[in-house]
Amino acid sequence: EDFVDQMDDQYFADEFNNIPTEIKPYDKKASIELIWENKVGDNDAHNLNLIFSQEFVIAASSDGSLQKMQMATGETVWEREIPEEIMIGVGGNFENILFITKNSYLWCLDSEGNAIWKIFIDGEVLTTPVINNKKVYVRLANYEILQIDLKQGDIDWKYIHSTPALAFNGTSSLTFSDGVIYGGFGAGKLVAVHQNSGAFIWEADISQIKGVTDIDRLTDVLSKPIINDAQVYAVSTSGDLTSVDRRSADIIWTRKISSFNDIAFDGFDIYLAHKSDSIYSLDSKKNGKTNWRNADLQYRRITNPIIIGNHIAVGDFDGYVHLLNLETGVVEGRAQISSDVPIGKNIHPIGNNKILGIDLEGNVFYMQVKNV
């Protein structure tokens, strides 16, 4: 059965006639209730992210609008207008709000939305800037990594890694652990560098390059690596999920599966969306063996999966949020939060039963999941 599933996803997922699967009836065992919704700006939100705490949410719109909201009620605390188009963000924290504008400037604002500094980034940025250990990290589309001083905005170091002539733009987020930065790169590489200096530590081949032409050989790691004790997991676009030893870079196990999305991990099982939008649960203790697969949402351009209580939650291109049982993969809940508007790539679990997200028109939504 697993072989048949892999054939369906791996070999038929590349067809040009990938029509989104129609919504199917299901046995409702969980409900999704909208707590509040708030619109940011007058323009779309591209695929912008947001930052949040227990008390507040900060989100942006591509027209330069920034908005701080109460987490409990959605009430607007303040609004700011930036005289540039916002392309990437929001990142950072509530003391240092980060985003990238269309003309390649990285901005840093304080908790009231006032500018602290901005610097020019020499290259395209496609991932949200992050703060770790009082430093700012920016990932460029050509896979370069920048460390920037949080107080002054000065560049401390730059890590440059060679990329193939033909590669996807670098969109994977970085993972930080024990003074090491892990990131996916072109040609199916997972790379580790020292956080303090940007010095290279090791690289591992997550996916084997196959084929003759550059297109045939195209394989990148576009998902955020996941840490599990002495292992790090990464998945490639061309068909491999791999567990790597963090000390030696040795391959512990690998299995065939492809994904462009970030993966979720609960300490035992790995949850990921195949590039066909089938959703898998894989046993990390058994070399990635399939626990279950759900193909009900194929080609619906789903978001990164998140774990919320005893469910997996994903959004899709039609504004739906779906709940799948964590143990079985069966759909148990669904709600159309944004009518005919795609949910942004990232939705976020808040505690065990709430979800925060933003759609591509800049509507921020806060929902509660209840078992029925």
Task: Name every feature range the model reports, one short phrase each.
Residues 61-62, 101-102, 140-141, 185-186, ...:
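Structural signature of WD-repeat beta-propellers
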Residues 67, 107, 146, 191, ...:
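WD40 beta-propeller blade core
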Residues 316-362, 368-372:
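C-terminal closing repeat unit and adjoining cap/tail of repeat-based domains
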